[in-house]
């Protein structure tokens, strides 16, 4: 029996063979692709847009940079990056083709298609040469990866020396009472929204469970350091509902 089938990981609160998780996650995002952006607005009250703006503020894109936007889905991060960096280019890499289809349509509508590439790929085995990109971003995607450490190692590999990693992800609130209140909202409201808006309760149940399984801010920062990154820092957003993590390939 191979390691991939004998080892297990989590899919939300379920324990599944490692070899099955990627396909299960692919199924989730295939089902929610057409409603993904709408649901993000509903789930966060639009606050995810402010978090992404904060990501760009800290990232400070520069003209001519090459961005790799992993789990970039519908292109939200790439569009923001390109608007702030004339002459920059972005590659959106996602394992779910239907998410990329949504992104391409948005790029065409925004007349940005000539600055974007769209690639189907796995965050744990990126189809790019080493030392290729100036910036690597992943927004609300790394918690869905089967082996997070492998994805961080790949981020380090494809970045040029001096390149920067920036991760936006849901995190853990430091205040237990606030975490309790947020959990009540997440588990009782978001799956219902998923049923009403996307006719898919189960996918959104998985998404909220995956948030609770993701490491806290300090643990995740240590994982980034383990991949080889230096100057690792993080910033809490909305009191820790989400967090930005930054690291440099130095």
Swiss-Prot record:
Q: Which Gene3D superfamilies match?
A: Vaccinia Virus protein VP39 (3.40.50.150)
Q: What does this protein do?
A: Methyltransferase required for the conversion of demethylmenaquinol (DMKH2) to menaquinol (MKH2) and the conversion of 2-polyprenyl-6-methoxy-1,4-benzoquinol (DDMQH2) to 2-polyprenyl-3-methyl-6-methoxy-1,4-benzoquinol (DMQH2).
This enzyme catalyses: a 2-demethylmenaquinol + S-adenosyl-L-methionine = a menaquinol + S-adenosyl-L-homocysteine + H(+); a 2-methoxy-6-(all-trans-polyprenyl)benzene-1,4-diol + S-adenosyl-L-methionine = a 5-methoxy-2-methyl-3-(all-trans-polyprenyl)benzene-1,4-diol + S-adenosyl-L-homocysteine + H(+)
Under Enzyme Commission nomenclature, its number is 2.1.1.163, 2.1.1.201
Classification from the root reads: Bacteria, Pseudomonadati, Pseudomonadota, Alphaproteobacteria, Rhodobacterales
What is the protein's name according to its record?
Ubiquinone/menaquinone biosynthesis C-methyltransferase UbiE
Molecular functions (GO terms): 2-methoxy-6-polyprenyl-1,4-benzoquinol methyltransferase activity; demethylmenaquinone methyltransferase activity
What biological-process GO terms show up in the record? aerobic respiration; menaquinone biosynthetic process; methylation
**What Pfam families does this protein map onto?**
Ubie_methyltran
Q: Which family does it belong to?
A: Belongs to the class I-like SAM-binding methyltransferase superfamily. MenG/UbiE family.
Assigned keywords, A-Z: Menaquinone biosynthesis, Methyltransferase, S-adenosyl-L-methionine, Transferase, Ubiquinone biosynthesis
Question: Which residues are recorded as binding S-adenosyl-L-methionine?
Answer: 74, 94, 122-123, 139
Q: Which organism is it from?
A: Cereibacter sphaeroides (strain ATCC 17023 / DSM 158 / JCM 6121 / CCUG 31486 / LMG 2827 / NBRC 12203 / NCIMB 8253 / ATH 2.4.1.) (Rhodobacter sphaeroides)
Pathway, per record = Quinol/quinone metabolism; menaquinone biosynthesis; menaquinol from 1,4-dihydroxy-2-naphthoate: step 2/2; Cofactor biosynthesis; ubiquinone biosynthesis
What is the enzyme's main class? transferase
* Superkingdom per UniProt: Bacteria
Q: InterPro entries, alphabetically?
A: SAM-dependent_MTases_sf (IPR029063), UbiE/COQ5_MeTrFase (IPR004033), UbiE/COQ5_MeTrFase_CS (IPR023576)
């Amino acid at each position: 029996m191979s390691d991939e089938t004998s080892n297990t990981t989590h899919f939300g609160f379920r324990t599944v063979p490692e070899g099955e998780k990627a396909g299960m996650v692919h199924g989730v995002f295939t089902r929610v692709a057409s409603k993904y952006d709408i649901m993000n607005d509903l789930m966060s009250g639009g606050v995810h847009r402010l978090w992404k703006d904060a990501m760009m503020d800290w990232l400070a894109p520069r003209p001519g940079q090459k961005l790799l936007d992993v789990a970039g889905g519908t292109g939200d991060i790439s569009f923001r990056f390109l608007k702030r960096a004339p002459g920059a280019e972005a590659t959106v890499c996602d394992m779910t083709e239907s998410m990329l289809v949504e992104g391409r349509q948005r790029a065409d509508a925004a007349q940005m298609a000539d600055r974007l590439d769209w690639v189907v790929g796995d965050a744990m085995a990126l189809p790019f040469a080493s030392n290729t990109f100036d910036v690597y971003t992943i927004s609300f995607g790394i918690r869905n990866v089967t082996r997070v450490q492998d994805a961080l190692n790949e981020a380090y590999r494809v970045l040029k020396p001096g390149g920067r990693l920036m991760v936006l992800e849901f995190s853990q609130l430091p205040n237990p009472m606030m975490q309790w209140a947020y959990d009540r909202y997440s588990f009782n409201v978001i799956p219902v929204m998923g049923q009403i808006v996307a006719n898919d309760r189960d996918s959104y149940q998985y998404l909220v469970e995956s948030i609770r399984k993701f490491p806290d801010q300090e643990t995740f920062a240590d994982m980034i350091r383990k991949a080889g990154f230096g100057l690792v820092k993080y910033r809490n957003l909305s009191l820790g509902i989400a967090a930005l993590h930054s690291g440099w390939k130095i």
